[in-house]
Amino acid sequence: MTVQLSNLEHLPNYQITERLDVVYGSTVRSKHVGKDLFAGLKNIVGGELTAYTELLEESRQEAIDRMIVKAEALGADAVVGLRFSTSSIAQGASELFVYGTAVKAVPMQQQPIYQSSNQPPSHHSGHSQYEEPVPSAAQPSTTAQANDDLPRFNPFGE
């Protein structure tokens, strides 16, 4: 099985059975002087710096490959929580670092989805939205007078 990669903390449709260790891969690259001069000219007129794009793509792949070798050595099925980091090492040289957690994982069993043909009981009272509901004994009437002798404030002046 090839090592699967996920930037999530889990692997979709898999159950993580064991966390093995943190694994990483890195590469340090420097710019090519000739490509750097061309990139400097391109920077003046604008546009994509394809030499740098290619350099970064190669660096990412090399760092990932090195991390996968370490994960395979641990017997991992996947690496989760995948992250990238970069740092400047020296003038014109940068490190690309990738890391994650090597795990053992097994596919989850797909549970069949059952749909019930029974509908939940309706709570419809039989009244339309325009009819005034009939108060029941369980519901106190809003028009009932208070039984105490305290004065009541009525904002409508009634």
UniProtKB/Swiss-Prot annotation:
Organism for this UniProt entry: Psychrobacter arcticus (strain DSM 17307 / VKM B-2377 / 273-4)
Region of interest (Disordered), residue spans: 113-158
Biased composition, class Polar residues, residue ranges: 113-122
Protein name per the record: UPF0145 protein Psyc_1853
Residue ranges crossing the lipid bilayer per the database entry: none
Family from the record: Belongs to the UPF0145 family.
